[in-house]
Amino acid sequence: MDESKKARSGDKKKEKAVAGILPHSNKPARVPLIAVPSHPVFPGMFIPIVLISDSDMKAIDYAMKGNGIIALFVLNDKFLEKNNNNAQQKLIIDYSKDIYSVGVTGKIIKKINLPDGGYNIFVSTFDRIKFVKVVLNDKFPIIEIDYLKQIPVRKDDIQSKAVYGSILLRTKEIFAHRKMPEVQLNMVNIEDKGKLCDIVASTISSSKNDHQIVLETLNVKDRLKKVLELIYEELNLIEIQNKIAKGIQERLEKQQKEFFLKEQLKAIKAELGIGDKKSSDLEKLKTKLKALELKGEPLEVVEKELEKFSLLETSSAEYIVVRNYLELITELPWRDFKINFDKLDLQKSKKILDKTHYGMNEVKDRIIEYISVLKLRKTQKGAIILLVGPPGVGKTSIGAAIAKVLRTKFFRFSVGGMRDESEIKGHRRTYVGALPGKIIQGLRITKTNSPVFLIDEVDKISASSYGDPFSVLLEVLDPEQNVRFRDHYLDLPFDISNVFFILTANSVETIPRPLLNRMEIIEISGYIDNEKIEIARKYLIPKVLSENGVDKDSLKFQSSSLVQIAQEYARDNGVRNFEKYLNKIVRKVARKLIENTEVKSYQISNDNLEEYVGVPVFRKESMPNAMYSGMVMGLAWTNYGGSTLMIETVKTESKVGGIKLTGRLGDVMKESANIAYTYVNSIKGDLSISKSFFEKNIIHLHIPEGATPKDGPSAGITIASAFISLALNKVVRPHLAMTGELSLTGNVMMIGGLKEKIIAAKRSGVEHIIVPKANRVDLEEIPTNIKSGINFYLVDNMREVIKLLF
C-alpha cells in the first residue's frame, strides 16, 4: 500500500518536471513574500531593496531567523493604477490578483536599518518560482511556491546560436554607448544562454511588462528571441537620443560661437571708440519683447521684424520705421489688466460720482450696476454707452469720474469734424509719417487693456473721400469684432473688448442706425434754474475761486444774483456759460483785490451784477401783455434747451384762399402748417366756421424772431389751434401753452424734449400745458418740483384740444 503511494507520488513529480516545474527537493516550499512595485528581478542578481511597510519588515525579520530565503514578486499595473502607483504599507493586497504569478527566490545577504525606521536589504536571487497560494497572512504573507525549470537549448540548434551571437554583439554596442564598466562587459561573455538573457534583460531600459515576459519565458530559445527584440528597440532608442543630443550640441556650439564673435566685435568697437547704436537698440527691444510672452501671429510678426531690423543700417529710413513699430508693440498692454474686484465698493463709488457731478442719476445708476456685475462675475467685461444731451451738462467730465470709480485709466479724444477714418484706425506703415489710430494710441498711453475711453462729439463726424469714420466705429464698438480689432498701423489682432467706451453727442439724428444699435443710449436732460444754482454753489464757485487764486472769504454771492445769472445770462441747458460768467466775475474781483488792498471782501448782488458781467443777454420770458385771436403759445426744443414759441396768424381777403408762412420755418414745420390748415378746413362745419373763411382769405402764419431757424413736427396742434382761434375770432384762455404733433386725421402724436419744454413754459409763467397722451410716461418721470404750479392736460385727438382752448 505504501509502495503504491510512493509510486504515484513519484509519477506526479515527474509530471511537474515535464511541465516546467521542479520538485521541491530540499528547497523551501513555503517562504515569506515581498511585493515590490518596481521592475521584475531576475535570477542570478545581487540587488538592494528599500522596505518601509510594517509587513515587509516583519517578513524580513522572520526570514533572517531561519534560512534567510524570501520570495520576490512584482505588483501588477492594475493594482498600482488603482492605488495611484502607491505601494505603501496601509494598502490591502490580494496576492492572488495583485501580483504577477512568476517571481524569484532570494537570500538576504545583509540588512541595514534606516533612520526613518525602514530596512535596506541586499538580496542575492536564485530560482524562478510560481505563486501557488497564501498559506498564512497574519502579520505578513507566507506563500506556497513551485520552482520552475527552464527548457534549455539543444546544442545543435543553429538558429539559437545565431541569436546568441547577435545578442553578444549588440549588447556590447549598448554597453559601449552607455559607457559601462569593463566588468559588466565581461559578464556578457558567458556560455549559459538562459543566464545571459537574464543579465542582458536586467540592463535594458524596457517596460515592466517586457521584463516580466522575459522572466516568465521558460523556453530559453524563445527567451533569446525576446531579448534580441528588446536589444534592437534599445539600439533604436539610443540612436534617437544620440541624434537629439547631437542637434543640441551643434546648437550650443553655434550659440557659443556667435556669442564669442559678438563679444569680440564689442571689444574691438570699444577699443576703437565706435558706439554700436543698432546693437544697443536691438538688445533693448529683444529684452522688452521677450517679457511680453507673445504667442501666435504677434510672435511671428515680431520675429520677422527683429530679423529685418538686425539687417538694416542705422542710416536707412526704414530703420526708424521698423524701430518705431517694434517700440509700439513693446508699449502695448498685451496681458490682461486685472481689476481687483474686492476693492470696488458700491457706496464709495456712489460718493465719488455724487462729489464730482450733480444729478445725472441714470448715468450713475448704470455705473453702479456695471460695478455690481463685475463683482458677481469676477471677470472683466467692457461696456458701450452713448450719453446724449445738450452742451455743458457734464457728459465729458463724467468719464474721468467713472475711470476713478473703476480704478483704471482714462483717455479722451474728440471726433467732432473728423473726416478721415485713419484717425481712428491708423495709417498703413507704407505712408510717410504713418501713426497708429486713436484706439491704439489710447491703449499705449494708458498702458492697460481695460481703460475708460471717452469718444466725444460723435454726432459731428462727417464722411469724405478719405473714408467714413462711422464705419470704423462700427467695428470698434461691435463686441463680436473688437475682440480682434486690427489697427492699420499695428496690423495685428488686439483685444479691446474690455474697454469701457463712453460716447457723447448732442443729438442722435446724424448718427447711423446700425451704430446706435450697438450702444446703450442714456439721455441727459438740461438743468433747470434751481439745479444750476445748486451746481454753482457746490461745484462751480469753489472751482473758479481756486483757479483764480481768490479766497472764499473774499467773494460772496447772494442767491438772487445767481438766479439772475441763470435766467438772464446763462439760459442754456448746461452750466458751461454759467461757469464763464462766474469766471468773469471772479477775475474782476481778483483785479480789485490787487488794485485796492484796503477792501478785503466783495459781495455780488442784483444791484451790482451788471457791473461785472454787463447788460443781460436774454429778456425775461413771459406771456404777452395782450393776447388776440389767432395767437397761441407753443413749446419748442433745441440742442440748447427748451423755449416758448408764439404762433401768430392773421387773415387777409383774397379771391383765392391759401396759406402764407414766414418766420424762417423748416420743411417739417411747413408740412405741419399745411396739415393743420387742411385738418381745420376739413372740420370747419363741426366748428361752425363759415365756408368762405378758407375760400376767400389767405391765412398768414408767422413765428417771431424770424432770424432764428425753426423746425420740427411738435407745433402741429399749436398751429391748428391758432387757425381755429382766428376762424372763430376767439382769444384762447390765458397762460395756456401746448405741444404735440398733429396727423391729417386729427390724432395727437408723441413729441420729444418734454422736460425742457416744461422748464421753458414755467419760466414764462405758463399755468396750463396740453401734452400728447402718448407722453404720459415721460411726464411722470419729470421731477415734481419742475411740474409744480402747472396743470397738465393729456390728449390724443385734436377735438380734445379744441375743448380746452377757450
Curated annotation (Swiss-Prot):
Per the entry, what induces it?
A: By heat shock.
Enumerate the subcellular locations listed in this protein's record, separating them with semicolons: Cytoplasm
**Which Gene Ontology molecular-function terms are recorded?**
ATP binding; ATP hydrolysis activity; ATP-dependent peptidase activity; sequence-specific DNA binding; serine-type endopeptidase activity
**What region holds the Lon proteolytic domain?**
626-806
- What's the protein called, per UniProt? Lon protease 1
State any GO BP term from the record.
protein quality control for misfolded or incompletely synthesized proteins
Keyword list (alphabetical) reads: ATP-binding, Cytoplasm, Hydrolase, Nucleotide-binding, Protease, Serine protease, Stress response
Q: Tell me the protein family, please.
A: Belongs to the peptidase S16 family.
What is catalysed by this protein? Hydrolysis of proteins in presence of ATP
The entry describes its oligomerization and partners as:
Homohexamer. Organized in a ring with a central cavity.
Query: Which Gene3D superfamilies does this chain map to?
Result: 1.10.8.60, 1.20.5.5270, 1.20.58.1480, 3.30.230.10, LON domain-like (2.30.130.40), P-loop containing nucleotide triphosphate hydrolases (3.40.50.300)
Output the SUPFAM superfamilies linked to this UniProt entry: P-loop containing nucleoside triphosphate hydrolases, PUA domain-like, Ribosomal protein S5 domain 2-like
Q: Which InterPro entries match?
A: AAA+_ATPase (IPR003593), ATPase_AAA_core (IPR003959), Lon_bac (IPR027543), Lon_bac/euk-typ (IPR004815), Lon_lid (IPR054594), Lon_proteolytic (IPR008269), Lon_Prtase (IPR027065), Lon_prtase_N (IPR003111)
For binding ATP, which residues are annotated in this chain's numbering?
G389, P390, P391, G392, V393, G394, K395, T396
Q: Which function does this protein serve? A: ATP-dependent serine protease that mediates the selective degradation of mutant and abnormal proteins as well as certain short-lived regulatory proteins. Required for cellular homeostasis and for survival from DNA damage and developmental changes induced by stress. Degrades polypeptides processively to yield small peptide fragments that are 5 to 10 amino acids long. Binds to DNA in a double-stranded, site-specific manner.
Enzyme Commission (EC) number? 3.4.21.53
PROSITE patterns membership: LON_N, LON_PROTEOLYTIC, LON_SER
Active site per UniProt: S714, K757
According to its UniProt record, this protein's enzyme class is: hydrolase
Q: Where is the Lon N-terminal domain?
A: 31-235
Provide the disulphide bond pattern.
Answer: none
Please give the GO cellular component terms listed in this UniProt entry: cytoplasm
Chief location of this protein within or outside the cell:
cytoplasm
